[in-house]
Every structure is written in structure tokens, then in C-alpha cells.
UniProtKB/Swiss-Prot annotation:
Biological processes annotated in GO: L-histidine biosynthetic process
Protein name in the entry: Histidinol-phosphate aminotransferase
Taxonomic path: Bacteria, Bacillati, Cyanobacteriota, Cyanophyceae, Oscillatoriophycideae
Family named by the database record: Belongs to the class-II pyridoxal-phosphate-dependent aminotransferase family. Histidinol-phosphate aminotransferase subfamily.
An MF annotation (GO) of this entry: histidinol-phosphate transaminase activity
Cofactor field: pyridoxal 5'-phosphate
Region: Disordered, residue numbers: 1-31
Native source organism of the sequence: Microcystis aeruginosa (strain NIES-843 / IAM M-2473)
Residues modified to N6-(pyridoxal phosphate)lysine: 207
Amino acid sequence: MLPTRDCVRQTPAYTPGEQPQTAGFTKLNTNENPYPPPAEIFAHLQEQLEKVRLYPDPISKELRQTAAELYGIAADQIIAGNGSDDILNIALRTFVNPCESVAFLDLTYSLYETIARVHGANIIEFPTNDKFALEGPIICPEAKLIFLASPNPPLGKHLDRDYLEATCANASGLVLIDEAYVDFSDDNHLDFLSRYDNVIISRTMSKSYSLAGLRVGFGFASRAIIEQMDKVRDSYNLDRIAQTLATAALKHHNYFEQVWQKVRQTRGRLITSLRELGFIVFDSEANFILASPPQISASELYNQLKERQILVRYFKHPRIQNYVRISIGTDGEIDRLLSAIQEIMGTN
């Protein structure tokens, strides 16, 4: 038998969204941005391709400085990572010893549990109510690190701001607020950084900046926190192509703001249309919705859509087994989805 660590052997592998290997699918299952980045960001790509034999900037200096100017944070309060998942792992490895406790909600991004178990941490899950929302702040003095996504998948709603404030104020360890979907909402928690010295905010460029294929993320925190996380960060953890295109994308922030508005408009139309078809659909502040179909099961809807080359996300989690998660696509993609659903439901 392989000499595998017990905590690794006993942990189920994380299950990512399906990536079709054939053309023709409408892909609404992994919360990617349906719109490409502007062509202008590729202007310096050739220059970087000619330098691929050389190591990239080990600290992503220009990228961090560009992010600092955009978000109004000092560059030394920012760490860049290989996607925001890298930031989650760095925080865990920096601040939590094996056998210490990590807390998160009972229904949230499933990678939190996976990486905590692989690390050998104790798991503490906090329950959400029947609307998948917090009913109060998380009070957990034994937790060295609390992962909280806001907006929180798979529902897509922000956590109650007052509850988050109280959680941060009362935490004896660190609180990492995962803002992967925040650009599709009207709120964020960057102001927490000036009021709580135990807060880390993670961001990704996969969703809102259309760079899921490059893997670029950030951690924002106090200088003291970033200094420690930087010791744990892998050397050269962000390649030069990713650094170049991500820096350029941030400089085209105005373009992406228009994209986010498009996504919000399409999201609203999809919610309204599905409710008219009898679906139970939660309001969302992300680039996806959670919906429960009438008449047939969520798994049957998933299968029938897949037969029509439309991918949505189905989870076997008992609390949401009657729901599918649908990423917001282009208007044309959503039209195709709605037509297929009407055909499946026999409402054409």
C-alpha cells in the first residue's frame, strides 16, 4: 500500500464541473464568464511568449500594484496566487496546524472541506436555515480559520453583513471572506480590512474578468498577514502570461463593468422566465442561479438538458438534490436553455 497520509487517503477528491470534450455544448455549469476579455489585453502577449524560457516575476509586482491602485489598497497588503483556490490553500497552510480547527457553512464551496481535510484539520460546520442563510454570527473560539463565501454558493446571495461583522469581531482566529462572485453584486467587504486585523479577502479573475483558463487570484489583508502568507506561497506561483494578461485586464476595468451589467440583466431575465414556468428560483447576486423544477426531478432535468448538449450543474448533496445550478450565459445561450426546458416540460 502506498505510504499515503491518513488524512489524504480518507478524503474524497474534489469534484470539479464537467468539461465537455466535444464541441457543440452550451456550457452553463462552471460559472465562467460568457463574454471574452477585450482584444486589447493581448497586445503584449507576443513579447511575453518570447520570454517563456525565463522565470516570471516571483512577487507579481506590477500585477499587485495595478490591483492596489484599482482597489485602494497598499500593494504590500496584496498577495497574488494561482487562482483564489491558491489563496485559500496558502491561508490554511500558513495559519492552521494539523489537528487545529477550520470552520465553514454546511452548504458552501466544497473545496473548503477538501483542503481542510487534506491538511489534517478538524472540521466544524455551521448550519444554515431552510433558505440556506445564516441565522446569526458564527461564534467559534476554537476555529483558527473560518472560510465564508459572500456571495455564497450555491445560493448566490451575500451573507448578512451584520452577522459577518459580528463574526469577524468575535473570532479568535482569522476569517477569510471569499469574494469570488462579488463583482456581480452591489456590495463588497473591502472596508473590513481597515477595521479588523484578522480578515483576509480573496478574489479571483476567473469569473468577472473572463480569465478562468489562466488561474489568477488575490488575497487582501493586513501587512502582517500578507508577510506570513508570502513565506508559504510557492516560488514563481504565477506565470508570466497570467501576470501580463491579468494586469492588462485590470486596466480595462470599465469594459468588464459593462460585462457585469450584461450578466446581471440576463440573470434577472432568466429568474423571471423560470419562475413563470413554475420553478422555485432564489434571488442571486452572483453569475449563477439555484433553481428547482416543477413536475420532474432536478437530476432528470440535468440529464435531459445534457442529452440536448446543454450542461448545468447538479449536486447530490441531500439539501439541494432537488435543485440545479445554472451559470448565466449570453442571451443566446439562455434562450437555448429556456427553449429546451419548455420542450422538456411540455410547455411549447
